């Protein structure tokens, strides 16, 4: 159904300079299988509502982590064991599980990356400044085998899921890994 015509210009000024939108769970529970057509409409609605800082952390994380782990000489099998399936990204990025619902295919990662690039382009065209996931120390449990002297903490189980490990931020490996992660995120 087409929208009715706008009879007169409407202008509303926001009270706050930063207007953040979305969270990890929304991406995983509601938007995990959205395509570009759905996202384009959502991004346009964001702009109409004055959103200027949308969360843009989920789709690109597959490629960021895949490439980061490749640079640390992880096997493709170990990388696939770390990346979760679609719909589980929120729990993964919040440090609750690793690999569940996977493995994801290279084609899936490429599609997610392409979708994210389109989303970013549109958001930036509309003056938004997307918010990305930062590196906070969550790492695959398999990192302990690659770097046995690093201070990597086992986080145990969450429900019935194996949680990712946590790299101590005071360990020298933290800065090295963060630098690789941010290079890959560009």
In which residue ranges do the predicted regions lie?
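Aromatic-lined carbohydrate-binding surfaces of glycoside hydrolases
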Residues: 6-186
